[in-house]
Amino acid sequence: MINKYALLINLVVFSYQLNANEISGTSGDVIAVKTDDVKEDYLSYRHDQSEYLILGLPYVYETSLKRIKDIDVEVQYKNFGESRITIKDLSKVDLNQKDRKRANAEALLIRAAIQSYDNTISPSFNFKNPVIGIISSRYGKKRYINEKPRSPHLALDIAANLGVEVSAPLKGRVILTGNFFYTGNTIILDHGFGLISSYSHLDSSIVEEGKMIQQGELIGRVGETGRVTGPHLHWTVYLNKEKINPEILLKDNFLQNLFEASQDIL
């Protein structure tokens, strides 16, 4: 009997050690992992003589284990609240066959752009706010449109008056522009190594695909194109193809704080 108790205690301790050593983070967050095994095409930084891999965590509906860049990460669920909006133009909600075909084709275009991977640009993570306005809907909220559940809101909405300037929050190359069914006038920027951002519902775009944009450079103006309830900027950020929370990138000393909160692969 004593041996059985001893075995049970050992199993509990071993399980605790496994959990303690587990790499973890919150849904939609960005984490830094200290490791000696950094591949050439991974987004990483050298700091204080150590290598840090930067990972974007996906939105999850429940706490779950995800494989990201050859690393097992426990992504913890977070309740971001909910958002309920009413769209009076029902043709933007229940699509006819023509509009659905268009929206699906545009989704493929955007998905292809997100696969972009430019290792000639090294992102600084020193993000600036792309527009002066008021946050009207935060990342991660469960979305209801006309009281029907839809996909969660994986972006940051910033309300502003029509025509307010939208500028690049970080240096990047324009990889896609277009007027799309859902997102209206849209610009997508590649900041390098899988860090990508998009700007939707613009009134106008003044950049062309292929152009390198500097931080703070004007790229467009706030509008209400596409499926919207009013003028605002819909700002989406991707890291390793996952939609992350843009708001956290605006914090002071973001990268330095990542290093200080880093986790080790043992």
Enumerate the predicted regions with their spans.
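Sec-dependent signal peptide recognition
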Residues: 1-10
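Residue-identity detector for threonine
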Residues: 2, 26, 35, 63, ...
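Hydrophobic h-region of N-terminal signal peptides that target proteins for export
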Residues: 10-18
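Non-catalytic extracellular/periplasmic "stalk"
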Residues: 19-134, 138
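Catalytic cores of peptidoglycan-degrading enzymes
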Residues: 128-266
